[in-house]
Amino acid sequence: QYSASIDDFARIMKAGNNGGYANTWLIADSRKNEIGRLELGLKNITLERTTDGYFVGSNFPINEKLIREETDFNPQDLGQSSVARHTRWEQLMAENKGKIDVAAAQRFLGDHYDVVEKKNDPDERTLDGHVDLSARGYPNWQPPYGTAGAVQNKVANAAMIAKMSFVAAAGHACGQNFKATEHLDAHPDMSWQKSLQRDMDAHPWTMFTASK
């Protein structure tokens, strides 16, 4: 939004970078039909780009040198949510090569396939994350049945980006509602959250466009 190119985006992101969040940042330049992947560590920074491929991300970098030198992350641990989700993204990209559009992206964000269990089972390892349904929780982040997951979704194609538009859905993309009272009744150990928890209903995909 504030950059003139992928290189300009990388410049903005690198300025004042303290390395506090080693991660993958995805960017698209609709004018050049080009996409990029910026991996931003403190000392290890990489920028890749393509005009006929794809990049995916799931809250961690994939550059081996960056992972090795600046994190304690284990990219081989499929049980970790980030690794499982990255694996699922790669599967979906391969299965849908040449067929990815807005509708497909919306389906992907509502995906419930767990690559560890090899079946549909919404939990912390699925793209449409449902930590609240997982007895494992999200280690180092959320306790078993913790109230967390993927509850905001946004999709845009090149034509929409050129018009500063996108479609978004609040709540789970799968359409499942989260009801606070039901969750607290099922997990009384979380009763201390009663004053904080709110329902999170799933809302339909809606188009948003910047005003002229």
Regions found by a protein language model. Name each.
Residues 1-212:
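C-terminus-biased signal that marks the final domain/tail of proteins
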